[in-house]
C-alpha cells in the first residue's frame, strides 16, 4: 500500500468512481457521505467508509481529516454543502483540498475560499467527448491550466514522413513533442530530426487552441 492518503467526501457517481480508482492504484482512501446507503455501497471498496456530516467540524476533527494528504470534495447535489465543507477543510488545515464545481460561478467561489484545485468533471468529460467525435486523431488530454494541456493523438496524415523540425510544430506553434509512441516502443524527448510515421502516437505540450488545430489536420 502506498503512503499517500486520500479522503473523498460525497459518494455520488463521480465520488464512487474516484474511490474505486484510487483504491485500485494502491492508495488508502476514506469515503465519507451523510447517506448511509451510499456508504454501504463503498464498504467493500474503500479502505475506510464512514457515514458522517461533512459540515460538522467536530466530526471532521474526530476523523483526523487534517492528516490526509488530499481531500476531495465531490459533493455534487448541494452547492451550499460543497462550499461550506471546502471552507471548513481549509480552516482545519488540510494540506490539499480538491473541490468539484458545478459551473463557472461555483468554481470561482471555490477558488476565492481557498480550494487548492477546482475540477469540472462533467464539463471536462463533455469537452473530451466532443473532441473525440470531431477528430479522428484525438486520444487523450491532461489539462495543465485553463489554456494549456498535454495531449495524446495519432499523427495526422499531413505530418507523416516529416521530421519534427519540418512539421514546424515547435517553431510555428510553440508545441513541444514530449514523446512518440511507436508500436511497443516509446521515444522520449525525440530530437528535431526524428521522423513521424503513420500510426505514431504523439504526446505533446502546448496551448489548447494549437493542439486542437493539429488534431483536426487531415
Question: Where do the PLM segments sit?
Answer:
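Cytosolic regulatory regions of ion transport systems
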Residues: 1-218
